[in-house]
Structures are given as structure tokens and as C-alpha cells.
Amino acid sequence: MDLCKKSINDPLNWEMAADSLRGSHLDEVKKMVDEFRKPIVKLGGETLSVAQVASIANVDDKSNGVKVELSESARAGVKASSDWVMDSMSKGTDSYGVTAGFGATSHRRTKNGGALQKELIRFLNAGVFGNGIESFHTLPHSATRAAMLVRINTLLQGYSGIRFEILEAITKLINSNITPCLPLRGTITASGDLVPLSYIAGLLTGRPNSKAVGPNGEKLNAEEAFCVAGISGGFFELQPKEGLALVNGTAVGSAMASIVLFESNIFAVMSEVLSAIFTEVMNGKPEFTDYLTHKLKHHPGQIEAAAIMEHILDGSSYVKVAQKLHEMDPLQKPKQDRYALRTSPQWLGPQIEVIRAATKMIEREINSVNDNPLIDVSRNKALHGGNFQGTPIGVSMDNTRLALASIGKLMFAQFSELVNDYYNNGLPSNLTAGRNPSLDYGFKGAEIAMASYCSELQFLANPVTNHVQSAEQHNQDVNSLGLISARKTAKAVDILKIMSSTYLVALCQAIDLRHLEENLKSVVKNTVSQVAKRTLTMGANGELHPARFSEKELLRVVDREYLFAYADDPCSSNYPLMQKLRQVLVDQAMKNGESEKNVNSSIFQKIGAFEDELIAVLPKEVESVRAVFESGNPLIRNRITECRSYPLYRLVREELGTELLTGEKVRSPGEEIDKVFTAICNGQIIDPLLECLKSWNGAPLPIC
């Protein structure tokens, strides 16, 4: 590759960085998903993506696995740099890590380059594992596989002085699903991830303390690992510079960051769709997504978030119903929704921009050459620099973690509104669906748990990179803490998965409650109408009675009153329905004037008959419709099936087999949430999520 020609028009790489952000975030996520699912990752040194790294990391979750192929065209460049090191040493050239010692002790000199590499690996094997091959002190095997991939990609570029055969051996380990055991802790990601990477080198050189895990989870020593992987020729005797090439890089931190960012991008889209579903079940006003509002703010993340929500809500059956509700008694209702709904695009937009920028930063890092010294064969020199400094990892992971915490905070705020009957526009308190609210507390426990999750997530949002300690005799006096930050971000992702699972189950509960509400309100309205006709239309002598004019107002009461405010005992005098129905008749009687003095035309005289018949009929009708609803054959179809958000509901209810939770059943909220959590961890959420947006054209609705 001719670096001079490549950079002549963009020497500072700003144009390349800007070009990488062209197009929508959603299109980028779709591309990431496609790359994640490809069966082969082809490495050439410059085109590795975050999704491909995540794919290799998650190979255990795939039946056939993903294979790695090395570009044969890279062989010559790799060999040239390796040959240069050997030639340089034979000429007596003094080079760091080849003839000179390491770090603060680089003033030491040796002519035994191979022994120096061997000692490098030995003294860096300073990690602690505890007991077992997958203990709390062992790096997750997924991250180790990803790190191996990233390190190969770096070394393929031919600036590191290592033999191609070593890269082929690491590739065989990956393709055979053999994973070296690396310590979880012990790196400051400058000079690279020295300690964990030394254990990969230890396996390649056959160190007796090396351990690996085989395809079926079995524990392997170095010899067994080579045998299973089909690596012939015995362990590697490292040549000068090769040990340094293996350990002096940012592969572990950037690999973990890649895994984290693949999932973070999915969660960014999910948060947009869940906010739209929240709007649907809350009977929210969709005007908060109007393009002009967001165009005037200029931020692309916000504009896209609003456009995605607008797309979900456009034509939504819930929005049409909500519009009618808002037109009823408009002066008695809030003019606008609360912030968790109304400002969700403004809240999520910056988080999406942060996650997207972090993704690009890490993609540049995993395609970078980040060891020291760098071998420039074309100019016949070794360059001593600091590309091993993993600051892009530490900074991008701190930023990503803060973005994830903000997404979680919004979810918690929306969840809190959803379960609160003061705010949720007629849904029952705690989203209880049972007949007796005194014995059904719905999602109360889940809300407490959500507060716990959110608190932990907010704590994790604190930065790691401001806790740098001077290391290695003050040679590494500033260091990135990249892997530490990536590990904390991985924890944040896990918590956000739990929060998303809990929230999605609650949203599906709310969807079903709206469905139940519609079925029950229909029968209440019909029953009130029928009872009114039977008891209020005719007088004692068959004449038309003035009370008949009350029916319209009685039905308006049914429309206005929240169904779940009286559903458990619809004819209770303590509940608003009966009180307000009576008030309608009293008001009509007061207007009846002198006619009230005549027993045959008195509306007051009709109140008792109306109430008695309603008490005799309405509870039975409500219970009958509820029983039909619970049997799975409701009279009115669920509106969600007509909405673009339906694929997520279908996943939770039909594919995962969750159900409407009530205090009358044994099943707990946690059991249902666990099903969704497992599905999210397995990636089952991705296709339904993208299906919700399959018809979006990538632009907001035009301003008309």
C-alpha cells in the first residue's frame, strides 16, 4: 500500500472520518447485522468491522461457526518486515525490544534477541486467574477470541516484524474454537494490553502455565491445543521482535469495545422503537415527532430518532384512538405530554451520535497498527512511537457507557409513568390485570427492580479514564485504561439488557390492558345504552318519558371515565361510574322543571329503576366479556396487529410464549422477563426490531 498516495487529498483523515458517518444510523445498523451473520471473516488489515469482531466473539452461539481467512496478498508485506528485523539485527542495529530492553529499562542491551522475547512473555505472565478455566478472574472467552482476531488484523499490515506462520497459527486456533485463557485484569492498555496478550504468546510458545479451552469447553494445555487445532511443527521459538509484536497492542481493549458497540447500536435503535410503543400505549400525542421541530434543532441523531418514532406512529391505530380521546374535553386535559415521552428524540439523539462516533473510532482502532517500534521497510528504519496508547478505546468506552446510562434513565422514566395511574391515561396502577386489584400488584416489584438497575447503571456511567495511575517506573505515566473502561461498558450493556427486557414485558402488558379496556368498555357502553332504553324511554302508561333524552349524556360518561377505575366492581357506589351516571339523571331532573312534580314524568322517579337494572345486568356482562377475552377469543381484535410495532409484540407473546400477568395466576413477572432477556442475549430481538422499520425510507415525513 502506498500511504503517500492514499493520504495526499486527506492528510489528516478528517474527510475519511466524516465520510464514514454518511447515511442513516439505522442503515448502518442493518449493515452491521448483515456483516455479523456472514460465515467468513476475511482479514486484510484495513477493512475489519466491529460487527465482524462481534461475530467471531459469539461463535459459540452459532451452529456452524464463523471462519477466519487471511489475505494471501498480505504475506509478502508481513515477510518483508520480519526479514528486515533479522537483517537489521545481523548488522548490529540497535532497536527497542530487539536488542534493547523494555520500557523504563530500555537502556539494557543484549545480542540474544530470541531469549529477550522469551523473557518478555515470562515476566508479562503476571495475571491472576483463581480457580477454573472460566472463573471470575478470567477474561470471557468471547473477548479473547475477538482479541485474537483484532491482533491478527493489525499484524497483517506488515509493520510489526513477525512471521506470517504465527498469524496462521492464531487463525487455526480461532477456526478450531480453541481459546487461550487470559486474565481479566492486569492491563492499562498502554503499552497496549501487555499482560493479557502475553498469554496468547505463551500458548504459541508452549509455556507450561498456558491453558486453553477446547471446542466443547474442555481444559487444554498448550500441546493439546496445538494438536486439536492442527498446528504442526511444534511450538514457536520467537525471533527478535516477535514477542513484542504479539503483546504490544490494543487488541484486547478494542476487541471488547467492538463487542460492546455492536450491542449498543442495537439498543440505540431499540430505545427509539420502545419510545414509540410507549407513546402508543400511553395515548400520547404524536406531534412531538414533527420534522420541523427537529430540523430547527439541527442535530442529526435527534432528527433520525424523531423520524423513526414518527414512522412507527404514522397510521398507528392507537394514535387514531388517542386523537379522539384528546378531542374530548380538551380544556380539562394537559396540553402536552411529559418529558419522558415528548422529549425522547432530543434525549436519545445525542446518545445515538455518541455511540455512532464511538463505533467509528473503534473501527479505526481495530484497523490500525498499534505496536512499537513500527518497521518501515520502504525507508529502512524502525520508528519508535506510541500507537499502543489505547486512548481512543478508553474515551469511546467512557462516552458509550454514559450514553447507555442515559438510554436506561429514559427507559426507567417511561416505565415509571407507565405503571403510575396518575400519569398513564387510564391504565391500572402497576399494570394490574386481575379482577381484584387488592390482590394483584402487577409490576410493583418490577418497578422496584428497575430503580435498582437504573441506579447501578448510573453508577457505572462514571468515567474510568480519570483514574489513571503512573505505571512501570513512571515510563507509562499516562495510560488509557481502555480495557477496564470496555469491561465496565460491557457490564452496562448487561444491565441495559435487563432493563429493556423488563420494559418490553411491561409494554406488552400495557398493550393487552388496552385491548381488555376496549373490550370491556364496549360492553359497558352497550349495557348502559340497553338499560337506559328499557328503563328511561317509556312512562308507566306507555308514553314517551323525558328521561329518554339522558341516554346520550350517559354514554358520554362511559366514554370519559377510565375503565379500570371501576372495572373490578362496575356498579359500586364508591366508584366514579355509578356516581356520574346518577349525576347525569339528577342534572336532567333539575332541568325538568314543573314536570318533576308529576310522578309520571319525573326523572327522579326513574333513577332507582335504572340503577337497579344496571346493577343486576352490568357485572355479569363485564365478567362474561372478560372470560371470553381470557379464552383467547375477544370480541374486538387487538389493535397492535395493525401497527408497525407489532413484530416486537409478536416476539414477546407468540414466539416466546409470555402472557398477560395477573395476581390470579401463578406465573411471576420475573419468569416472563427472563424469557425476553434470554432472547435479547441470543440476538432474537434483532429481526423483529428491524421488521418494525422495514418500510421506513430513511427520511422524516414531509412538512405539509
UniProtKB/Swiss-Prot annotation:
The answer on whether this UniProt entry bears the keyword Transcription regulation reads: no
Q: Which reaction does it catalyse?
A: L-phenylalanine = (E)-cinnamate + NH4(+)
Where, by residue number, does (E)-cinnamate bind? N248, Q336, R342, N372, K444, E472, N475
Which keywords accompany this UniProt record?
Cytoplasm, Lyase, Phenylalanine catabolism, Phenylpropanoid metabolism
Catalytic-site annotation from UniProt: Y96 (proton donor/acceptor)
Enzyme class, broadest EC rank = lyase
Xref: Pfam families: Lyase_aromatic (PF00221)
Instruction: Tell me the residues linked by 5-imidazolinone (Ala-Gly).
Output: A190-G192
GO cellular component terms, A-Z: cytoplasm; protein-containing complex
Kindly list the biological process annotations in GO that this record carries. cinnamic acid biosynthetic process; L-phenylalanine catabolic process
- Specify the pathway: Phenylpropanoid metabolism; trans-cinnamate biosynthesis; trans-cinnamate from L-phenylalanine: step 1/1
- State the Gene Ontology terms under molecular function: ammonia-lyase activity; phenylalanine ammonia-lyase activity
- Listed EC numbers: 4.3.1.24
Lyase among keywords: yes
Annotated compartments: Cytoplasm
UniProt xrefs under PROSITE patterns: PAL_HISTIDASE
Protein role: This is a key enzyme of plant metabolism catalyzing the first reaction in the biosynthesis from L-phenylalanine of a wide variety of natural products based on the phenylpropane skeleton.
Subunit composition? Homotetramer.
Q: What is this protein called in UniProt?
A: Phenylalanine ammonia-lyase
Gene name, per UniProt, is: PAL
